[in-house]
Amino acid sequence: MFSKLNLLCFFILILLFSCSKKNNDLSVLKKDNLENQMIEVYKQGIEEFEKGDVIYAGKKFSEAELLFPQSVWAPRAVLMSAYGYFTQGYYGYAINDLERFLVKYKYHPQIDYAYYL
C-alpha cells in the first residue's frame, strides 16, 4: 500500500511539473506587427485592384479586415472590396460586403457612401 501511495505521488508530481513549464515555442503577434501586416495586405489589394483583378483584390481587402478589425484601415478595406465588386458587376459580393460594413461600422463617417453604393 505504501509503495502504491509513493508511486501515485510521484506521478502527480511529474504531472504538475510538466504542466508548469513555460512554453517558449508559442509565437505571439504583437499589435504593431499585426497592423503592419494588415497595411501590407491592404496595399496588395490596392495593387491588384489597379491591375484589374477585382476578385483577388476583394479577397485581399477581406483578409486585411480580418487581420486587424479595430484599425482605421478595416472599414476602408470593406468599402474598397465592395466598390471593386460593384464596378465589375459582382453585385452579390458587393451587397454582402456593404451589409457587413453597415452592421460592423454603424457610426463610420463614410456610412453614407456605403448606402450610396
Task: Give short role names for the model-derived ranges.
Residues 67-74, 102-112:
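Short solvent-exposed coil/turn linkers within tandem alpha-helical repeat scaffolds
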